[in-house]
Amino acid sequence: MKKLAFIYFLALSVFCTATAQKHYTVVISLDGYRWDYTEWYDTPFMDMMADKGVKSALIPSYPSKTFPNHYSIVTGLYPDHHGIVANSFLDRTTGESFSLGNPEQKINPVYYGGEPVWVTAQKQGLSTAVFYWPGSDVRIGGQYPNTYYMYDRKPRLTIEERLNGVIGQLSLPESQRPDLIMAYYEQPDSYGHEYGPFSKKTRSVIGHIDSLLTDFHAKLVKLPIADRVNLIVLADHGMSWVGAGNSVKIASRLRPEWIEKIDGNLPANIYCRDGFADSVVNALQGLDHARVWKKENVPARLNYGTNQRVGEVIVDPDLGYIIDERDLPGGGMHGFDPACLDMHALFRAMGPDFKHVEIPHFRNVDIYPLLCRLLGIKPADNDGCVEEIAEILK
């Protein structure tokens, strides 16, 4: 009897140990991968993920631009709250202009509010590795990811090298293996811009990405820990066609003495000199194909306008138009209202903690608390709510 009891408790111990094995989280971002590319193009890998795991799409934060949204994904904060309010902006406090084209400014932590998930994880004893995710080469909260790469240090790793790097990190001994691994890839965004979302070139790059991920997954499933890896593939925003000549021109309506700076085109942030915001708004009344707001009057659903880095006046173009003084050729663009389906982005997930389910499109600020739930860590303050998507979790 004692022998049987011993065997029972030994088996129970082994079972509990096995079930308590830690899970790992891998997040891959494909810049500008519109949510319905999987319906327009042949994407067997994405289809496989949908068949085995979670199929949905992400609603971007406003404005639906790359840098603000990648940082929203990892902090759970809207751009207005984390401070990267656009790809370029004027900081009223410092008087400096932030631009992705200025490497020194881009890695200055003063611009980055909130707490990225790699910092949250490391503060709670976990390890992280991040391949080129926007903001990962910035010392935020006094920390970098445990493993990271400087984006402006060239040559950059190719997408094949990044994906192989993920496999390499997962292949490390358990004591060295990161709990969270994230990787960013610039495509299909640039093809979408140059050729539009529905073109042979975009079809080609979507097929190439799918093939690379198929190869990546084939390597992943051969790892001893394959059944302990949660894989998420997502994007920051979608893409929409802007026809040739669809430029909304505003400069001729404005007096130079009213304006300190105009930044961006989707939307345009107008930084006004003291006392001239009303003059700018009045001058732009009746503008075709765009809405004009003082920052305090931006619709609440956009969660935008309270940050001092947002211009005093925002000009928000209709879908299919852009704020520009030039007559531009047609091309793909993003930055539009997140309510536009064209702006919605890919989301797929599969692994030991995910159900097989399809859910409605959800906010990208919910990703940060989701990652914290997967990692078993306490999130920092954020605008997301993992309970809104709890049905995707086992």
PLM regions and their residue ranges:
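A long, amphipathic alpha-helix that forms part
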Residues: 157-171, 188-229, 278, 371
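Bacterial Sec-dependent N-terminal signal peptides
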Residues: 1-23
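Loop/turn elements at helix/coil->beta-strand transitions in domains of secreted/extracellular proteins
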Residues: 21-26, 51-55, 123-129, 175-181, ...
